[in-house]
C-alpha cells in the first residue's frame, strides 16, 4: 500500500491533538506504520522558528510577510528532512497542520495574498498536496475558549475574533475547492468526532472495520 500524507487542520481549540490521537489509534489497529508531527515545527530548526513566531520575546513587531516566510522556512525544513523522506520509505505521515494553515492564518487572518503562499508551496515544496485533509470546523469563540483552558494564549491566539473569523472563512473555502478534504463539526461530542474520523479513514484506506 502506498504511503499516505494525512493532515489535520482547524482553528486553535478545534481539537486537532485529540483527532490525531484517533488517527494514531486507527492506524495502529490496522498495522499501518506512521510518524506523527506538527507545524509550525517538526524538526529542531523548525521548532526554533515556531517558538519565534508564537512567542516573540523581542521588542520588534513581526511583519505579516516575515511571519509567513519564517513559517515557510520551517516548513521547508520539515518537508525536506522529515515528511518527504518518510513518504519515500513507505511510511505514512500524519501532521497537525500543513500549508493550509498558512493560507488561512497568514492569508485570511493577516491579509497576505494567497497567490504568494501558493507560489511558496509550488516553488519550495514541489507543490506537495496531502492525500487527505481532515478539517475540524469550530466557531472561533468556542475554539478560543477551549484553547484558553489549555494554557496562556500565544502571539497568534491573541490576534482577536475578527482575525479568526477571516481565518475560518479561508479554511472553509479550501475545503469546498478540494477533492481530498473532509469537514467535521468539531463542536460535536468527542465520541461523534471519533466515529466520523474512523469512517473517513475506512473510506480512504478502503477498510471495513
Swiss-Prot record:
Question: Any coiled-coil ranges, and where?
Answer: none
- Pfam families for the chain: Thymidylate_kin
**Alphabetical list of Gene3D superfamilies matching this protein:** P-loop containing nucleotide triphosphate hydrolases
List its EC numbers. Answer: 2.7.4.9
GO BP term, pick one:
dUDP biosynthetic process
Keyword ATP-binding present in the record's keywords: the answer is yes
Print the keywords alphabetically.
ATP-binding, Kinase, Nucleotide biosynthesis, Nucleotide-binding, Transferase
Does Nucleotide-binding appear among the keywords?
Answer: yes
Molecular-function GO terms, alphabetical: ATP binding; dTMP kinase activity
List, alphabetically, the GO terms of the cellular component aspect: cytosol
Q: Which reaction does it catalyse?
A: dTMP + ATP = dTDP + ADP
For ATP, which residues are the binding ones? Answer: 10-17
**Superkingdom, according to UniProt?**
Bacteria
* Protein family per UniProt: Belongs to the thymidylate kinase family.
Q: Per its database record, what is this protein's job?
A: Phosphorylation of dTMP to form dTDP in both de novo and salvage pathways of dTTP synthesis.
Name assigned to this protein: Thymidylate kinase
Amino acid at each position: 500500500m502506498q504511503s499516505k500524507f494525512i493532515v489535520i487542520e482547524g482553528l486553535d481549540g478545534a481539537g486537532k491533538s485529540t483527532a490525531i490521537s484517533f488517527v494514531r489509534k486507527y492506524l495502529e489497529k490496522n498495522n499501518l506504520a506512521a510518524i506523527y508531527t506538527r507545524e509550525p515545527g517538526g524538526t529542531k530548526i523548525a521548532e526554533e522558528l515556531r517558538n519565534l513566531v508564537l512567542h516573540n520575546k523581542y521588542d520588534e513587531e513581526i511583519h505579516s510577510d516575515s511571519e509567513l516566510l519564517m513559517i515557510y522556512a520551517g516548513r521547508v525544513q520539515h518537508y525536506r528532512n522529515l515528511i518527504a523522506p518518510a513518504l519515500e520509505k513507505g511510511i505514512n505521515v500524519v501532521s497537525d497542520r500543513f500549508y493550509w494553515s498558512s493560507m488561512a492564518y497568514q492569508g485570511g487572518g493577516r491579509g497576505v495574498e494567497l497567490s504568494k503562499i501558493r507560489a511558496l508551496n509550488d516553488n519550495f515544496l514541489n507543490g506537495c498536496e496531502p492525500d487527505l485533509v481532515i478539517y475540524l470546523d469550530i466557531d472561533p469563540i468556542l475554539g478560543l475558549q477551549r484553547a484558553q483552558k489549555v494554557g496562556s494564549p500565544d502571539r497568534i491566539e491573541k490576534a482577536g475574533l475578527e482575525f479568526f473569523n477571516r481565518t475560518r472563512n479561508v479554511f472553509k473555502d479550501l475545503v469546498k475547492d478540494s477533492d481530498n478534504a473532509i469537514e467535521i463539526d468539531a463542536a460535536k461530542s468527542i465520541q461523534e468526532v471519533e466515529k466520523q474520523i474512523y469512517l473517513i479513514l475506512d473510506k480512504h484506506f478502503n477498510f471495513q472495520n
